[in-house]
Amino acid sequence: MTTTATPPQAIQVSVLRWAPPIVHGLVRDLRVRWALEEAGWPYRENVVSPADQASAKYRELQPFGQVPAMECDGLKLFESGAIVHHIAERSPALMPEEPAARSQVTAWMFGALNSIEPPVMMFNVLDMIYQGPKGEEYNGIRTWVAAWVESRLDVLAGVLEGQEYVLGRFTAADVLLATVLRILRDTDFVRKRAALAAYQQRCEARPAFQKALRDHLANFAAHAPKN
């Protein structure tokens, strides 16, 4: 597919009405917002409540009742990776023109979601969300998952040595990789790897990311529960 700079006419992104502060900056609508900002595509929010998520109408858009989902000129899409890929396929800001280079971007997008995010999410659940007993069995599992995370990040750090982004220039792969790394923000996994720390800072310093994050957080602030 040849990329085009012409944006669709009507884009709506479904986002959570509110979420606890522990996940602010992590909910996956941030990826979609960032990709849209990089592409220069204007969009409007469809703010959904828990009741909306459970409704038959919303399940037609997102079968699992999650966010994000996107409606784009009549097309309905769900899953953040699929949405970012759809945007990238149509935006030269996120995807190069040359076929082999495009394939490499796609490979790294899948790598972010299939090879790196699963152990990262598992560690996050164990370390920050799980509230059950934390005895010898828990510690053994946590140690094993931490080693899994370390091994994946060692590979990524090696790839990033000496270059700004995973494929040289910024692409949609970096949108997914950087948002996966954000999940580890309360750990030292990224901080202790200079190449990864610099990479994440570089990605998050981009104006498009900053705008996406501001809008993501502003939505939660606007709908925060009243005390």
Protein language model features and the residues they cover:
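GST-like fold's C-terminal all-alpha helical module
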Residues: 2-4, 112-205
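Active-site-flanking alpha-helical
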Residues: 88, 180-181, 213
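Terminal-tail/helix-coil boundary detector
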Residues: 214-227
